[in-house]
Amino acid sequence: WVYKKLGVGDIMYRDYDSHVIQEGGFFQAEYNRNKLAAFVSGSLSNTTYWRYGRFYYDKDHARSKTVNYMGFTVKGGANYNINEYHNVFVNVGVISRAPKFAYGAFMTSTTSNVTNPNAKNEKIYSAEAGYGFKSAWLTANLNVYYTLWRDKAMTKTGTLTNKETGKETDYYMNMTGVGARHMGVELELKSEPLTWLSLNGMLSIGNWEWDNNATGYAYNDAGQPLTSNGGIASGVMADDHAW
C-alpha cells in the first residue's frame, strides 16, 4: 500500500480486534453502632486478553496466545464520632489489578500479537487517617495518606539517531516494574458565615516520587526491537536491544 493510491474503505497499517473478558465477585460487610462505623470489602477478578490481527498475519496465525491475570482488592475502614462536633477515621486498602491491554500485556497491541513476558499485576498499597470537625458554620476535614505503587507498566516515546547517517527513528519503550511512593496531607474547609454566603477552601501538600529504576526496551511502530542507532536488533532483549 506504500505506492498504491488508496480509496474509501481501504485498510492500511493496522487491522485487528482486541478481546477482553473479565469475571469477578465482590463482597462487603458493614458495622454501625453507637459512635463507631466500620466496613470491610473485597473482590476477586480474572482478566483474559487476546488479540486477532488481520494485517500482518495469515489466518492460521491471526489469533495471539491468550493471557490471564487474576486480581483482587481488600479494603477496610472505620469512623469514630467523638461527639457531635469531632470525628476521626482510618482507611486501608490493597489492590492487585491486571496490566493494561496496550503497552502492558501486549508489546505493541496496534500491530503485533507479541505478548509481554514481563507484564505483572499492578499492586497498590494505601492507608489514610484523618480528623473531621463540623459545626453550624464550619466544616473541616484533615487527612494524611501514604500510597505505594508496585509493578506499574508505563510507555515512553522518543527518537533514536544513527550517529553515522543522522537518520532518526521513532521508538516507544515499554517499561514494567515501575514503582512510586505518594504521601501527603490534605485539608478541606467549608464555611457558611451568612445564609447567602458560602466559602470553600482546599489545601494539598504532597510528595510524589518514583522510587526505583525501571528498565524498558525500545521498539518501532511495527513491534520490532531496535538498536541504539535505530536499526533492527538481533532479538528481543538481546545484547544489542536498546534499553
Put a short name on every predicted segment.
Residues 1-83, 103, 108, 215:
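Signature of Gram-negative outer-membrane beta-barrel scaffolds
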Residues 21-27, 42-44, 72-76, 88, ...:
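Hydrophobic, lipid-facing positions within transmembrane beta-strands of outer-membrane proteins
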Residues 35-38, 85-88, 137-140, 195-199:
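Repeated loop/turn-to-beta-strand initiation elements of outer-membrane beta-barrel proteins
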Residues 25-31, 76-80, 129-135, 144, ...:
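Residues on the lipid-exposed face of transmembrane beta-strands in outer-membrane beta-barrel proteins
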Residues 46-57, 66, 80-128, 139, ...:
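Surface-exposed extracellular loop regions of Gram-negative outer-membrane beta-barrel proteins
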Residues 32-35, 146-148, 169-243:
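Gram-negative outer-membrane beta-barrel transporters
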Residues 1-2, 39-43, 91-93, 141-145, ...:
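Transmembrane beta-strands of outer-membrane beta-barrel proteins
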